[in-house]
Curated annotation (Swiss-Prot):
Superkingdom classification of source: Bacteria
MF terms in GO: 5-oxoprolinase (ATP-hydrolyzing) activity; ATP binding
Annotated NCBIfam families: PRK05406.1-1, PRK05406.1-3, PRK05406.1-4, PRK05406.1-5
UniProt keyword Hydrolase present: yes
Described purpose of this protein according to its UniProt entry: Catalyzes the cleavage of 5-oxoproline to form L-glutamate coupled to the hydrolysis of ATP to ADP and inorganic phosphate.
Identification of the protein by name: 5-oxoprolinase subunit A
EC number: 3.5.2.9
Family: Belongs to the LamB/PxpA family.
Amino acid sequence: MKIDLNADLGEGCASDAELLTLVSSANIACGFHAGDAQTMQACVREAIKNGVAIGAHPSFPDRENFGRSAMQLPPETVYAQTLYQIGALATIARAQGGVMRHVKPHGMLYNQAAKEAQLADAIARAVYACDPALVLVGLAGSELIRAGKQYGLTTREEVFADRGYQADGSLVPRSQPGALIENEEQALAQTLEMVQHGRVKSITGEWATVTAQTVCLHGDGEHALAFARRLRSTFAEKEIVVAA
């Protein structure tokens, strides 16, 4: 069994360098919610050094609230903003001898695209326009995954180790109780259940079916690195190979 481990980088966390030794894919902030040209260059350089797949992490234009503000923008605006961000990272990667492999939207852009078909289409269209060989990463079973497949893109369905799920397989909004799993044992058990058995227990007790092709590790939690190391160790014990 194989699984991809991804982390969002270039967002101002001190753990970026260590996370790059533990994950197989890096989603690099492109300046709209965090990061800038220099952090993009630095993250790309470290990803190449560690043999980690390089990906763009585009966002709504929302540095004030870290890309977590809901926005209702015209699809053509989202298309242009997404193309702008992923094009910038692709060029930075190429200039350093690397290749951008995937795109994963950030924050509220990710969450809204999981449910809003027009928004999902705009993102998928931008990814396809940049490079049809790019992998589009989105929430398992989401509108974004469906849109990517409609454009003929390779898609990668994502699950979260430390997020609570609703009965329909969507994430519990961060504003609601149960959104974040802070207990390490619970997060580890949830991750193994999703990866090995394709299901997750919702906060209301029902089982939801999920396809787990990549697991997101957040690097900004207090015990993020310790959990990442433990997850890697557990995967090794279960003979689950970590690779992009």
